[in-house]
Design a protein with these regions (language model features):
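Proline-centered turn/helix-capping motifs that create local helix->coil transitions or kinks
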Residues: 484-491, 523-530, 604
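Divalent metal-dependent catalytic cores for phosphoryl transfer on phosphate-bearing substrates
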Residues: 134-160, 288, 300-302, 306-308, ...
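Non-catalytic interface/linker regions that flank or bridge core catalytic/transmembrane domains
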Residues: 2-128, 135-137, 141-506, 575
Length: 691
């Protein structure tokens, strides 16, 4: 592999290797990340001192590997000092990658494959796509490249592309690449939404600028134009499938920072759609277009910066592209981000509460934004479906707007602050989703959930009806929680919002666990679990007090996160809160008792031998009445099932049922009936316990 005569090859200039910074701020001085002047000098000297191109190429790989490692260390060190400066970090990794790719391109173009007078067909443009195209790179993000030619790829272009890729692979970069003509891009983009999304984010890196400009013009003229409805539909469907794959919950305690619900991909989907519709280039244009309000955009930026910071720290900690915030990484990530123990809570718990708070904000923003777009731009439902669809009867001051519940006049609506509560009940009654404008009205007027409202008898009635009247209270509670209305109406609920439980047992945050428990109670009440939960189902069917049950579940973990037994503290809090929800004195006492002892039945059944008469006797003495036993049994079942998808199993069911039946027999017939011989239950064998 001989080299051309040195006199025929121009020297490389530093300016040709420097990416355009524009207004981008890096986390460190650009020359500390990649010094183009020093590398240019190295190239010119190295070329003069090597006898053949292979030696020249090998020396370049060694030097670029050293430079990249030093640049990564510089970014990491600066990030350690400023652990929340995520925007500067992801731009810095992009700058480093751009510098390397521009350098490799010029090496190949000038020295490895020089063409003194290239023809029109021998033009090549290097395009960044995907996250790299957005200038958003974590330490170990993929580098997605499009090698673009005006027409069919020529032998020269093939040689250049091959040389570029082999050098980048030798540098251990994870490259995703394609070589296409402009017509190829248009054809494949029409067929594949993933390719179309990548092309939406294309960015010129180096090479022939005219070819890149031609692609951009043709994309907007021939591909993106007049296809917004299809694109939005595809992105919304893609989002739903992604959420389902990641567990379907925003509050999974080991979340995926990139793909999970409330993660970075949700924010990116929002911007993709805005860009597709309005050709926006900067996020700030979302406010100018009226797609987000200023305060929503501030939340957007803060959440995005936080999530990117978490993702970058994860990559650094694991030395790979890791996006799953698993238990073993949460402590180290919290430490890297500067969190400390506070008010009896571990640093990791404070960190994760912040994480879920930001994830909730992402949900608020994307829901409002995407729901509005879905209503405006997605294809209408088929004619027959529209004709035969049941239109619910709507009460004043509400209306149906784009098949969602909204209000006729927001000024009139806000004259009565109880309407903020009535909105959620009306949504349950009609089965309609709440329109984004109505959700914005709730968020913007949270201050109306004041002391007077909490003491208002009508407000108490509305909230209790939410819980017990419509059969699916979890829908309203989850939406209230996400909008901040639940904690505004019950301030004692605020500390457990987005609260992480740092153990392997719980799958959800405390607030989401609470709502899951209420969802299970509603399923039992709707008689959907008769075969699986015969005792709990019969208790509900026989007329158990639903006001007590739903209130107890809503408040059962409200004492968590403090330096005190959460059952004891929760019972004291419930004594104050339950009357505000409209419960009478006797009901309040029962709720207080249930919360104080909401772990008792589970502990007795799973930690003691229920074939021992003393276990049943002790439990019966604590419970005292069949009514309490019934209520505690239902509460226990819902609490266990609400922990996670697989926490309820046949072994636990057998234990709970046996303890219930034996205790009920004692409470009805007296302690003299309690002998080991009359107990029909025997402890499970070791094999049964494993099963």
């Amino acid at each position: 592999m001989t080299r051309p005569n040195r006199s025929t090859i121009p020297a490389c200039e530093p300016s040709s290797l420097k990416p355009d910074l524009g207004e981008i701020e890096l986390i460190s001085a650009p020359e500390k990340i990649f010094d183009a002047s020093k590398f240019t000098s190295f190239l010119n000297i190295c070329y003069s001192n090597t006898s053949d191109l292979k030696s020249f190429r090998d020396a370049i790989v060694v030097e670029l590997r050293r430079i990249r490692k030093a640049g990564m260390i510089e970014i990491d060190n600066s990030f350690t000092k400023n652990p929340l400066s995520a925007e500067q970090v992801i731009r810095s990794y992009t700058w480093l990658t751009d510098s390397i790719i521009k350098s490799v391109w010029h090496i190949c173009k000038i020295w490895l494959h020089p063409v003194p007078n290239p023809t029109q067909a021998e033009k090549l443009s290097i395009i960044a796509v995907g996250g790299y195209g957005r200038k958003e790179m974590a330490p170990y993000s993929d580098v997605d490249l499009l090698f673009l030619t005006p027409y069919k790829t020529t032998p020269w272009a093939e040689s250049v592309i091959e040389s570029i890729l082999y050098i980048l692979w030798d540098l251990k970069l994870k490259i995703g690449h394609s070589s296409r003509s402009i017509s190829d891009c248009l054809r494949l983009g029409k067929e594949d939404y993933t390719i179309r999304t990548a092309l939406l984010e294309q960015r010129f890196v180096d090479g022939d600028h005219a070819t890149a400009k031609e692609l951009e013009m043709r994309l907007w003229k021939d591909l993106f134009k007049l296809t917004a409805k299809d694109f939005i539909s595809a992105k919304l469907e893609e989002r739903d499938l992604r959420h389902e794959k990641q567990g379907g919950q925003r509050y999974m305690v080991e979340p995926n920072v990139k793909e999970g619900k409330g993660g970075l991909r949700d924010l990116q989907s929002l911007f993709w759609i805005a860009k597709y519709l309005h050709h926006v280039k900067e996020q700030s244009e979302l406010v100018d277009l009226g797609m987000l309000r200023k305060e929503e955009f501030v939340k957007f930026q803060k959440a995005e910066n936080f999530l990117w910071a978490v993702r970058c720290h994860l990559h650094i900690l694991t030395n790979r592209a890791s996006d799953q915030l698993s238990f073993d990484l949460q402590v180290e990530t919290a430490e890297r981000m500067g969190y400390q123990d506070s008010k009896g809570r571990r640093a990791v718990e404070v960190f994760m509460q912040d994480y879920f708070t930001h994830a909730t904000r992402v949900g608020d923003i994307t829901r409002i934004f995407l729901t509005a777009l879905e209503a405006q731009h997605v294809k209408e439902m088929p004619l027959l479906q529209r004709i035969f669809r049941r239109i619910p009867q709507i009460k004043d001051p509400y209306t149906v707007l784009q098949n969602r519940l909204s209000v006729k006049s927001f000024d009139a609506f806000l004259e009565d602050k109880l309407n903020l509560l009535r909105l959620f009940e009306e949504a349950l009654r009609t089965g309609l989703l709440i329109h984004p404008d109505a959700m914005r009205a709730v968020s913007a007027n949270i201050s109306l959930f004041d002391h007077d409202m909490r003491q208002n008898k009508e407000a108490q009635r509305i909230f209790m009806d939410l819980l017990i009247k419509h059969g699916n209270p979890e829908r309203a509670l989850r939406r209230m929680n996400e909008l901040g209305a639940l904690a505004a109406f019950i301030p004692e609920f605020q500390p457990i919002v987005a609260m992480m439980q740092f153990n392997m047992y719980h799958s959800y945050t405390v607030d989401e666990h609470t709502i899951q428990c209420i969802s299970h109670l509603a399923q039992i009440e709707r008689e959907e679990l008769i075969e699986e939960l015969p005792i709990a189902s019969s208790i509900l069917k026989s007329g158990a007090n639903k006001r007590i049950l739903y209130t107890s579940l809503l408040l059962h973990d409200i004492g968590k996160g403090q330096n005190e037994d959460h059952s004891v503290l929760g019972a004291r809090i419930a004594r104050k809160v339950a009357p505000r929800l409209g419960l009478n004195k006797k009901e309040v006492e029962t709720v207080e008792w249930l919360i104080r002892y909401h772990l008792l039945m589970s502990d007795m059944a799973q930690k003691r031998d229920i074939a021992d008469p003393r276990t049943v006797r002790d439990f019966a003495k604590a419970v005292q009445t069949v009514n309490r036993l019934d209520l505690l049994t239902v509460l226990t079942v819902c609490d266990i099932r609400g922990v996670g998808p697989n926490t309820w199993n046949n072994w636990k069911a057998v234990l709970i049922r046996a303890l219930y039946r034996q205790t009920k027999k004692v409470l009805e017939n007296g302690y003299e009936a309690l002998t080991r011989d009359c107990l029909l239950y025997t402890s499970p064998s070791p094999r049964d316990r494993v099963q």
